[in-house]
C-alpha cells in the first residue's frame, strides 16, 4: 500500500502548492515549491487530527481529511490565479544551495532510518537514541487509533505532553498500509524541502541579495565554532573524530563544545525540530512580507500555516510569538496606527490564540505547568550549573561554540538596515528568554530556541561579510578572504557531517524484528507489556505497544514522575505476585537479554510455572498473563 501513501501525501502537497500560489501569485517556483511543502505538511498534521479527535485515528477519519484537502486543492486550482511560469532569476542560486544538502540528507536518512543490514536494523550515531522513541510513538498512535494519544512509555494514567503532531504525520501512512520505513520517511522528505528552501528565501527577502542569502544558508546549516582546534594536536585525536561516539568538533562535551550541527544532530534525529522548522521557516518568510513589506493580506495564509505549530514543535511556536512581538512593536512605532494596519495583526493574534489555546490546554501547556522539572529559572543554557556558576566564561563559551558568526554579531547589527535590526530584535528576545528560563527538564533543549536567534544572526553576518568583501577590488583577494572566512566558520561542521556519514551502529536484531512482527500481528492493540526499561525495547519501538516503564532517558525528559512504574517494574520481575500484575493491568511479560542484564534477580521461573509461553525466539520469551 505504499503507492496509496504516496498518492495521499501528493494530495496534501498539491493543496499546499495551490495555497502558496494563491498567497503569492507572482512568486516563482523557487518560492512556491518549498512554501507549498510547508503548507502541505501543515495540512497533513492539522486536518487528519481534527477528524481523528472525533472519529479516532482510523481510516475513515484519514479519508475524510483527504477528501476535504482534495476539494480545497480543486477549488483553489479552479478559482486561483492561472499557473504561468514567471521569471525566477534566483532559482539557480537557491537550488545550488539546497541540492547538495539534499543529497547528503537523503544518504543519511537511508543509512540511519531502519536500514536493513543482514537481517538487522542499523542506524547512525545521531539516531541511535531518539529514533527509537519516535518509532514507538508513531506506531502506537496508528495501532491504538487514539487522539490525543495515550502515553505509551508508562503504565497508569499519564498525560501525553509531547508535541505529538510531529508523529501523526507518519502514523497516517501506517494506517494507510505503508511499511514503517516508508511511513517514517515520507513526510520528512517534504519537510526537508520546506526547511532548506524556506531558510534561503527569507534570507533572500530580508537581505535583498541572492549571494548574501547563499552565505547565510551555509553559515546556518554548516556553520560551527572553534571546536575543531581541540582535535589538531595529534593525528590520533583527529582520527578520533571519525571513530568515537560523539567526539566531534560540534559535540565534544569534555571541552564544553555543545553547539551541534543542525542537520545531523537536530533535523534528522529530532522530528519535532524538523517539522517545527518546516512550518516556522515559511512563517518567517510570510511575517517579513506581511510586516516589513506591508502585504497585510498575508495574515490569513500565515495563520493557516501555523495552526498546528504548538503540537508539532512548541519551541518553534514560542520563537514565532517572540519574533511576531518584535515585528508588532515595529508596526506600532514605525507605521501609521490605522485600522488597515493594525486590524490584520489583531485578527492574526485572535485566530492563532484561540486555536493554539485549544490545542495546548490539556497537552503541552498543562504539562509545562505540572510536569516534573519543567518551567524554571536557569542561567546561560548548558553552560550554567545548578549552583548558579558557569563552566566557562559567558562570552568565551559562545565564541568557541558558535565561532565567527558570534564574533561578528555586534558589527553586523550596526551594519544592518533598520528593518533587519527590528527582525533581529525578535532573535534577541529569544536569546534573553532562553538564557534565563528553561521549559523542560533537559536544559540542553533550550537550543531549539537559541538556533532561531542564531539563524537571524547568520543573516546579519552574511550581509556584513559580503558588503565588506565587495569593497575589495581584486577579485582573487576577495575570493580568498571569503573562502578563509567560510573555512573558519564551517570546518567543524564539515568534519561532523563526515563522521555522521561514516557512523554505523546495530540497533535491532533479526530476532527483535521477528518478535515485534509477531506482537504486531497477534497482541491486542491496547495490551500492556512488562519489559525492561531499555531505550531500544522492540515491544514499544517496533510494535508500538504500551509498556509499564520506558527508558528514563525518554520519560524523565518528558517531565514524567515515573517512580511508581520503575519500582513496579523491578518488583514484578524480582518478586512477582498476581495482585500487582492485575493492579498494573499487565497482559504480557517479556524476558530477554535486556531484562537479565539490567535486573539481576529476575524470576522467570515464577511466570513459567503459572502462565503459558506465548512467544519464544532466540533469547526472548513472552508469557501471556490474561486470557
What does each of the following model-derived ranges do?
Residues 297-308, 323, 345-350, 416-438, ...:
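Transmembrane alpha-helix segments characteristic
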Residues 189-192, 273, 318-321, 443-470:
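Hydrophobic/aromatic-rich transmembrane helices and adjacent perimembrane loops
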Residues 282-290, 323-335, 400-421, 467:
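Hydrophobic, aromatic-rich transmembrane alpha-helices
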Residues 1-91:
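Membrane-embedded, hydrophobic transmembrane alpha-helices
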Residues 104-109, 222, 226, 312-316, ...:
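Transmembrane alpha-helical segments
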Residues 102-279, 315, 505-506, 533:
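Active-site lumenal/periplasmic loops and adjacent helix-entry segments of GT-C-fold
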Residues 264-267, 286, 299-314:
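Membrane-interface alpha helices of multi-pass inner-membrane proteins
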Residues 473-627:
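Extracytoplasmic
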Amino acid at each position: 500500500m505504499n503507492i496509496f501513501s504516496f498518492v495521499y501525501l501528493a494530495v496534501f502537497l498539491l493543496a499546499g502548492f495551490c495555497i502558496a500560489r494563491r498567497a503569492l501569485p507572482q512568486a516563482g517556483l523557487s518560492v512556491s515549491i518549498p512554501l507549498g511543502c510547508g503548507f502541505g505538511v501543515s495540512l497533513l498534521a492539522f486536518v487528519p487530527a481534527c477528524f481523528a479527535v472525533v472519529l479516532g485515528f482510523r481510516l475513515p477519519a484519514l479519508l475524510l481529511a483527504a477528501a476535504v484537502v482534495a476539494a480545497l486543492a480543486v477549488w483553489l486550482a479552479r478559482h486561483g490565479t492561472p499557473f504561468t511560469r514567471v521569471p525566477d532569476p534566483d532559482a539557480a542560486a537557491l537550488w545550488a544551495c539546497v541540492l547538495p544538502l539534499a543529497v547528503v540528507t537523503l544518504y543519511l536518512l537511508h543509512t540511519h532510518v531502519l536500514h536493513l543490514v543482514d537481517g538487522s536494523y542499523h542506524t547512525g550515531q545521531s539516531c541511535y537514541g531518539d529514533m527509537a522513541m519516535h518509532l514507538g510513538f508513531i506506531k502506537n498512535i496508528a495501532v491504538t487509533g487514539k487522539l490525543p494519544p495515550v502515553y505509551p512509555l508508562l503504565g497508569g494514567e499519564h498525560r501525553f505532553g509531547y508535541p505529538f503532531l510531529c508523529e501523526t504525520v507518519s502514523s497516517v501512512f501506517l494506517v494507510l498500509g505503508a511499511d514503517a520505513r516508508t511511513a517514517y520517511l515520507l513526510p520528512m522528505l517534504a519537510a526537508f524541502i520546506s526547511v532548506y528552501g524556506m531558510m534561503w528565501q527569507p534570507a533572500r527577502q530580508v537581505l535583498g541579495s541572492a549571494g548574501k542569502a547563499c552565505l547565510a544558508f551555509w553559515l546556518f546549516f554548516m556553520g560551527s565554532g572553534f571546536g575543531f582546534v581541540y582535535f589538531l594536536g595529534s593525528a590520533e585525536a583527529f582520527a578520533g573524530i571519525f571513530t568515537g561516539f560523539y567526539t566531534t568538533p560540534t559535540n565534544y562535551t569534555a571541552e564544553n563544545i555543545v553547539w551541534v550541527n543542525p542537520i545531523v544532530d537536530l533535523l534528522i534525529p529530532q522530528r519535532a525540530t524538523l517539522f517545527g522548522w518546516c512550518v516556522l521557516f515559511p512563517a518567517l518568510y510570510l511575517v517579513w512580507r506581511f510586516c516589513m513589506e506591508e502585504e497585510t493580506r498575508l495574515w490569513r495564509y500565515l495563520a493557516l500555516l501555523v495552526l498546528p505549530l504548538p503540537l508539532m514543535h512548541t519551541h518553534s511556536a514560542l520563537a514565532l510569538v517572540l519574533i511576531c512581538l518584535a515585528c508588532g512593536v515595529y508596526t506600532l512605532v514605525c507605521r501609521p496606527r490605522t485600522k488597515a494596519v493594525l486590524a490584520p495583526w489583531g485578527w492574526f493574534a485572535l485566530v492563532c490564540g484561540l486555536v493554539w489555546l485549544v490545542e495546548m490546554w490539556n497537552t503541552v501547556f498543562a504539562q509545562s505547568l505540572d510536569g516534573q522539572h519543567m518551567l524554571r529559572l536557569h542561567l546561560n543554557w548548558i553552560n550554567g550549573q545548578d549552583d548558579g556558576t558557569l563552566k566557562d566564561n559567558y562570552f568565551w563559551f559562545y565564541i568557541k561554540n558558535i565561532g565567527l558568526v558570534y564574533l561578528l554579531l555586534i558589527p553586523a547589527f550596526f551594519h544592518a538596515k533598520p528593518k533587519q535590526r527590528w527582525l533581529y530584535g525578535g532573535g534577541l528576545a529569544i536569546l534573553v528568554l532562553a538564557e534565563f528560563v528553561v521549559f523542560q527538564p533537559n536544559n540542553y533543549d533550550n537550543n531549539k530556541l537559541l538556533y532561531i536567534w542564531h539563524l537571524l544572526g547568520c543573516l546579519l553576518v552574511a550581509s556584513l561579510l559580503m558588503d565588506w568583501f565587495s569593497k575589495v577590488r581584486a577579485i582573487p583577494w576577495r575570493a580568498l578572504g571569503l573562502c578563509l572566512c567560510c573555512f573558519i566558520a564551517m570546518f567543524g561542521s564539515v568534519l561532523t557531517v563526515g563522521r555522521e556519514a561514516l557512523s554505523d551502529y546495530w540497533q535491532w536484531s533479526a530476532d527483535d524484528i521477528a518478535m515485534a512482527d509477531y506482537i504486531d500481528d497477534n497482541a491486542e492493540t491496547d495490551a500492556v507489556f512488562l519489559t525492561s526499561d531499555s531505550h531500544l525495547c522492540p515491544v514499544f519501538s517496533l510494535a508500538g505497544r504500551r509498556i509499564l516503564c520506558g527508558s528514563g532517558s525518554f520519560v524523565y525528559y518528558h517531565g514524567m514522575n515515573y517512580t511508581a512504574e520503575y519500582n513496579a517494574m523491578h518488583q514484578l520481575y524480582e518478586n512477582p505476585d498476581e495482585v500487582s500484575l492485575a493492579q498494573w493491568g499487565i497482559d504480557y511479560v517479556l524476558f530477554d537479554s535486556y531484562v537479565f542484564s539490567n535486573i539481576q534477580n529476575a524470576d522467570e521461573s515464577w511466570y513459567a510455572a503459572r502462565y503459558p509461553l506465548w512467544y519464544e525466539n532466540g533469547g526472548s520469551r513472552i508469557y501471556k498473563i490474561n486470557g
